[in-house]
Regions:
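Non-heme di-metal
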Residues: 2-252
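Single conserved hydrophobic/aromatic residue that forms the stacking wall/gate
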Residues: 251-265
Length: 265
């Protein structure tokens, strides 16, 4: 998130996490994959891999909503009032934002629209989603889908975090390990290709700019407050959050390396 380095100054433990991740994030944002995104085919292949990270991000935030609010019947109050409010507001934007035509859509669906417009293949991700619907099981569905092992490792890590039921860890990975990792360079590459008439990428540019806009103005401050609320003064929780963030950022880098390898075949 663009404003995170300013906001972390308000809490020493948040500073610790941010400092811990600076080097890893710089390496990720300057990854060589962005140097080879020069053609329509490059961007298509990138999106065909990256869409799985977009999908499992939605499961990450929904896990927080499930744990921090009451989504069961009959309803009962939840003790996490502040964190619950914050996560509900974040879910509203992530799950029910608007597209270029003003229609309500999740950010995942916005990304699929972008893939369709740019000509990226959506067969594998759609097949995976259908298996999720049929099986009602992530583990069974991912094992039945022919995915690269690194993409599977990336998603398996996310679900390991979710299954830990440690809300402070889930919130921290959501905040530091996922929201802040769309490099400006990628957006500029897409804009450049779009201006050269090589691709029609209105939906993708909208998705990327919308993601950054919502994050900078709303999700960044909300997510930081949520981490403070969930970790409190517990040093063990802060340590667990930092370790998970470090691994999440490294796996983000590995996920991009796979896309880079595809380009070099």
């Amino acid at each position: 998130m663009n404003n995170i380095k300013t906001l972390v100054k308000t809490k020493p433990t948040l500073i610790d996490i941010d400092v811990e991740l600076i080097y890893l994030k710089e390496n990720l944002n300057s990854h060589k994959i962005y140097q080879v995104l020069k053609s329509v085919n490059d961007v298509q292949l990138f999106m065909e891999n990256h869409v799985f990270a977009v999908w499992d991000f939605m499961s990450l935030i929904k896990a927080l909503q499930k744990n921090l609010t009451c989504v069961e019947l009959p309803w009962v109050p939840n003790k996490n009032n502040l964190a619950g409010r914050l996560v509900n507001e974040i879910v509203l934007a992530e799950e029910s934002d608007i597209d270029l035509n003003g229609n309500p859509k999740s950010h995942f669906e916005l990304y699929l629209d972008s893939m369709n417009q740019i000509g990226a293949k959506t067969g594998l991700i759609n097949s995976f989603i259908n298996k999720i619907r049929e099986n009602n099981s992530y583990e069974k569905s991912v094992n039945e889908t022919d995915l690269n092992s690194t993409v599977k490792d990336f998603m398996n890590f996310t679900f390991d975090i979710i299954n830990s039921n440690k809300n402070h860890v889930i919130a921290s990975v959501f905040t530091f390990g996922r929201e802040d990792l769309i490099p400006d360079m990628f957006i500029e590459i897409v804009k450049k290709l779009s201006k050269s008439d090589k691709i029609k990428a209105d939906n993708l540019i909208y998705y990327l700019e919308r993601h950054i806009e919502v994050d900078a103005d709303e999700h960044g401050p909300m997510a930081l407050k949520m981490i403070e609320e969930l970790c409190g003064n517990d040093k063990v929780k802060w340590k667990e959050a930092t370790i998970a963030d470090r691994k999440s950022t490294r796996l983000n880098s590995s996920h991009q390396i796979i896309s880079y390898a595809v380009f070099c075949l």
